Amino acid sequence: MNHYDQYQKYKKKYLDLKNQLNNSSQYGGNCGNYGNNQFNNQFNSQATNRYQTGGAEFDLKDEVAFWGRQMMEHLLLLHLGLDEEELKNSALQNHMDWKRYLTENFFSKGVNPGPDQAFLTTNELEKIGLLNKNVVNGLIDQTIQYKSKLVKTLNSGQWVGWIYPAMAQHMLEEAEYFKRKVNGPDYTPEQETKFVVHHHSTEMGATTQLLDPTEKDNIKIAKSYADICMSKLSGRNKKPFPNQWTSQEEAILRGQDPVDLATLMRISLKYSRELTQFAKETGQKIDSKQLKSIIHPVLAHHIFREFYRFTKRLEQLGAQ
């Protein structure tokens, strides 16, 4: 059983126990392996609403553990990539603030997720105490404020280092998504599905610029995902990526061909699953030094975790 199976199993047990306790008081009585079908079936069968009674606390812990880690890594990457002193130092300070928070509330309690781990295990969830949402929001707002300032500076044309505007904008949007997941309002299934597609497209757009110019085939593949024009490469040269895509499917992903929600979610899930596998295999090439790029192995795993988590979120939405 993998991490998210355990997470969902424990969450279900907690909800059942909570309901039993509620009923007894009223009546006077008594956290992956990609492509694993068993995993997918169990995940779908246990899908629950985020604010279902008793479940919100555990979802908050998992959201903060995941996205807090992503924010911490974003800020370290920005610190390393910036040259302008104030922005560079501010990125490091924000990084350290997240690191201290995660150390105090997660790492020091034995909750140290692996490089590809996108969800906490049942044992890890049990170790975490109550989280102060005000503290979490303070860190998120601080991060959004910093990234917003950086985006504005970069869009003005000022050179401050080796971070380009689209990368910083992508990081800002993830921070804003994190804030909404913690505080609401809840995304509708359509809103969140469209956000996932946008996220994946912009993620691949940023990744494309980090590949060595000699990696022509990989650049073409990554750019096809970024521009959502995979059909131009589908089936060519017997490459595993991209898979078979039609221009109609791409139009749906780009929002140019309005369809019912079920169709949108089906095509979006296909896109997300394929990118998750692509990110996994690309990360393995980076780890084994088979790909020329300036992508640090930590960033490769960072990207995989996001694709994997969003894929599972789409599967959950589809099961509701």
UniProtKB/Swiss-Prot annotation:
Return the GO cellular component terms, semicolon-separated: virion component
UniProt keyword annotations, A-Z: Coiled coil, Virion
Q: Which residues form a coiled coil?
A: 1-26
Q: Which Gene3D superfamilies match?
A: Protein of unknown function DUF2935
Record InterPro entries: CotB-like
Subcellular location(s): the record lists: Virion
Domain of life assignment: Viruses
Alphabetical list of Pfam families matching this protein: DUF2935
This protein's name? Uncharacterized protein L567
In its UniProt entry, the species of origin is given as Acanthamoeba polyphaga mimivirus
